[in-house]
């Protein structure tokens, strides 16, 4: 996905989020603000973490009013401390009030993912293993959540189903066997650079190697099974460990020497980073 396409998609999703929240009008703001009055408000971080999503935060207000100005004191990827001032937002107070929740939802969610990803990625430092996300993302938030993973030091697996072949258990069941599924994928999508197959036992590992899989995902296998699987694979395919990956066991898994470790928790279980807009006043 190129930069222009990503921007158009992001704008569309942000606009939909604003429609969802504001609907026909912000009745509370309109009841206390009868006309345009300029104001400013401080963007403050209330937890230590890694910031991500500042441009998305900014875009929320720009789509409501292009005259809104934001001065940031941090950039995406920066480590932030509790109580730190991240920036100042200036503009029509009605816009600041109506856009506040949507803007913060994006920033808190994305910063939470970046923070959690960073804490896991640090455990892989100094190894060859790359930390990957999955497609287990919040509906209509994937473009933002996968960006946040990258900010936190992780890597993106497939963005969508068009990005590559990943043969999972149900695909294999539909095809009839690992071998048949891999051959069908090769016949249908020869332009795809790599074909990945998910395996659950050593027999499937052997079959995937013999069928010529490019990447073999060891899914929910025990540590000892994975050690044996790597001996079977013996460099004939890249390797990925997935399933029940936690911060508590990831260092042990890294010790196996797999090429990739994928974790859905990076996006589906990361807590938000507490960030707020405080001190709104007329200028």
Descriptions of predicted regions:
Residues 2-211, 215, 228-232, 238-241, ...:
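Acidic/glycine-rich phosphate/pyrophosphate-binding loops and surrounding catalytic core
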Residues 271-280:
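Structured adenosyl-cofactor binding patch, chiefly the S-adenosyl-L-methionine
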């Amino acid at each position: 996905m190129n930069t222009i396409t990503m921007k158009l998609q992001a704008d569309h999703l942000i606009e939909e989020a604003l429609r969802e929240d504001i609907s026909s009008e912000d009745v509370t703001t309109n009841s206390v603000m009868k006309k345009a009055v300029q104001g400013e408000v401080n963007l403050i971080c209330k937890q230590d973490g890694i910031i991500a999503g500042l441009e998305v935060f900014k875009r929320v207000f720009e789509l409501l009013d292009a005259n809104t100005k934001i001065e940031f004191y941090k950039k995406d990827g920066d480590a932030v401390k509790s109580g730190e001032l991240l920036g100042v937002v200036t503009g029509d107070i009605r816009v600041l009030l109506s856009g506040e929740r949507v803007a913060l939802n994006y920033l808190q969610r994305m910063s939470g993912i970046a923070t959690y990803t960073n804490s896991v990625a640090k455990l892989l430092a100094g190894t060859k293993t790359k930390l990957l996300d999955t497609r287990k993302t919040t509906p209509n938030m994937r473009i933002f959540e996968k960006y946040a993973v990258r900010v936190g030091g992780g890597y993106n697996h497939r963005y969508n189903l068009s990005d590559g072949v990943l043969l999972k258990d149900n695909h294999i069941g539909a095809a009839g066997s690992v071998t048949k599924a891999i051959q069908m994928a090769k016949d249908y999508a020869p332009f795809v650079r790599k074909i990945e197959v998910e395996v659950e036992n050593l027999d499937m590992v052997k079959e995937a190697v013999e069928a010529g899989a490019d990447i073999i995902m060891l899914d929910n296998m025990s540590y000892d099974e994975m050690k044996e699987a790597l001996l079977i694979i013996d460099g004939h395919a890249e390797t990925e460990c997935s399933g029940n990956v936690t911060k508590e066991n990831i260092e042990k898994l890294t010790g196996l020497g797999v090429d990739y470790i994928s974790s859905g928790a990076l996006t589906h279980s990361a807590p938000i980073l507490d960030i707020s807009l405080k001190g709104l006043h007329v200028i």
